[in-house]
A protein has these predicted regions:
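Hinge/capping helix and adjacent helix->loop/strand transition within the periplasmic-binding protein
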Residues: 87-93, 108-195, 244, 257-290
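An extracytoplasmic/periplasmic, membrane-proximal ligand-sensing/linker region
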Residues: 34-36, 180, 268-328
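N-terminal twin-arginine translocation
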Residues: 2-33
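A ligand-binding cleft/hinge motif common to bilobed small-molecule-binding domains
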Residues: 102-110, 176-180, 206-241
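Beta->alpha turn/N-cap motifs
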Residues: 97-102, 163-164, 193, 210-215, ...
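Short loop/turn segments at beta->alpha junctions
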Residues: 7, 77, 144, 189-192, ...
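N-terminal (or domain-start) structured segment
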Residues: 28-118, 158, 166, 183-206, ...
């Protein structure tokens, strides 16, 4: 039984328990006087960002004494939801859970983004980090990262590298792999992670760098092979798989992340309050258990630390992926 399958059942139980637990302290408030926090998820229901929001939402409500309403505003790689939050006034009491792609897309869109990161949207806190792995499908004759790179250099036309779309972690991490290895990899974007994995498993593409949260079940089943993990140390779920640096690709460290953002006009006092409450929720044993099963690790810290880290991430990927790439 895969760890991912177990995690889905655990998460569903946790979400159900959370909904029941929240009923007394928050819903008991007078509806006319209760403050509502709108938590926007810029992706469809069921993904890792959505599940994290539904685990944390009821607990945030309990600690804040507010009603938390989760709204999925999917589309354009997260830009639709992010644009809506960026346009909200501080009085709207709105926040967003965002994946890496949402914060790096405005930079690589070369001025085509409807909002400016760090001006129209400001970070509240980092939430979790998610390790990735370099994956190959059954049609690729490579047993190690070194063999994969050698194959990409020797095969006429190189190898096809799948992604979940422009600006996603599989895209930018793939571009970094191409840059550091010198291998010939051709980017093949897909409409989301599910399609990307389906094409990779089917042998219609050759390689992908993907979040372990979504690909671990396919590695465990043997449908995909992990040649390396992209973290600084080996992953407990895949102890026999080396890190990319151990496999000889120095400097190749990639981690996806989830973070909380608020409209740029949000007062600093409110940012600090939300930051503190999120950190408290993230320390709860049930939350730690659930995110661990999703291959996530807590990454909360002060507001200023979050901004410093996220600015560095935007700068890093802007150097890897040319401006305007997302519009190609």
């Amino acid at each position: 039984m895969s760890r991912f399958a177990c995690s889905r059942r655990t998460l569903l139980r946790l979400i159900a328990t959370s909904a029941a637990a929240i009923a007394s302290p928050v819903i008991a408030q007078d509806a006319a006087r209760a403050k509502t926090l709108k938590l926007v998820v810029p992706f469809p229901p069921g993904g890792s960002t959505d599940l994290l929001a539904r685990i944390m939402g009821p607990r945030l409500a309990q600690r804040l004494g507010e009603t938390v309403v989760i709204e999925n505003k999917a589309g354009a790689g997260g830009n639709i939801g992010a644009s809506l939050v960026a346009a909200e006034p501080a009085s709207a009491n709105t926040v967003m859970f965002a994946a890496t792609s949402v914060i790096i897309n405005p930079t690589i869109q070369a001025g085509n983004s409807p909002f400016q990161i760090f001006r129209d949207l400001v970070p509240v806190t980092r939430l979790v980090d998610i390790p990735c792995a370099i994956l190959v499908g059954p049609s690729v004759n490579a047993a190690s990262l070194g063999e994969l790179i050698a194959l990409a250099k020797s095969r006429p036309g190189g190898l096809n590298m799948a992604s979940a779309g422009f600006g996603t972690i599989p895209h930018v991490a793939g571009e970094l792999l191409k840059s550091l290895s010198g291998g010939a990899f051709t980017h093949v974007p897909h409409k989301g992670q599910a399609e990307m994995l389906r094409e990779l498993i089917g042998g219609r593409t050759d390689v992908a760098v993907d979040l372990l949260a979504g690909s671990l079940q396919h590695i465990e089943s043997g449908r995909l092979r992990a040649l390396a993990v992209t973290s600084t140390r080996r992953q407990e779920a895949l102890p026999g798989v080396p890190t990319a640096e151990e496999a000889g690709l120095k400097g190749y460290v990639v981690s996806a992340h989830q973070s909380m953002w608020a409209p740029g006009s949000t007062p600093r006092g409110r940012l600090d309050q939300l930051n503190r409450v999120v950190a408290e929720v993230m320390r709860e044993p049930e939350v730690l258990q659930a995110i661990s099963k999703m291959m996530m690790t807590p990454a909360t810290g002060p507001v200023d630390e979050a901004e410093k880290y996220l600015r560095a991430e935007v700068s890093r990927w802007a150097q890897v992926v040319p401006a305007g790439s997302a519009a190609q």
